[in-house]
């Protein structure tokens, strides 16, 4: 079960990232100004390059880059407005996992995110996947609202620091069944 490496919806194209995209993707990463506040850390140096070359693989035995997709969200005029990744087969063999989903701050609020999530769900369903999972930092209220409003409403776990503080961080795992 593999998704397509390229698909279109309305005025957007989703395609697998290439080395030539690094500059644009780093710029989109930089547009997430409150990442450190919400997650406790910024993007590691070389994050995008590492995702393209090695994948951002889950912590499971046998994780393989052939199951990893870093995907670009691109307007028909060629402008890259975001990216996301998918890992096929985590945390189980029927689930695809999203570990990052980011729309450039300059174009947020135009329903691009909702449209892309709907297309990801349809693409995964068409490819035979039963569900999509993801993790959201609990301090990321905007992200929690976005994902729950898009049907990711089943809690699959909570991980992280056990005591709350300004410097403590936890993640909630959410899942959407593809019926």
Question: What residues fall within each predicted segment?
Answer:
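Terminal substrate-recognition subdomain of acyl/acetyltransferases
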Residues: 1-5, 164-179
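Acetyl-CoA-dependent GNAT
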Residues: 4-12, 16-108, 117-119, 123, ...
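Short secondary-structure boundary/hinge segments and terminal tails
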Residues: 47, 125, 142, 154, ...
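Beta-strand secondary-structure signal
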Residues: 69, 133, 173-175
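Conserved glycine-rich acetyl-CoA-binding loop
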Residues: 79, 104-118, 127, 138-144, ...
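Conserved GNAT acetyl-CoA-binding A-motif
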Residues: 124-135
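Conserved catalytic-core motifs of GNAT/GCN5-like acyltransferases
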Residues: 133-137, 148-170
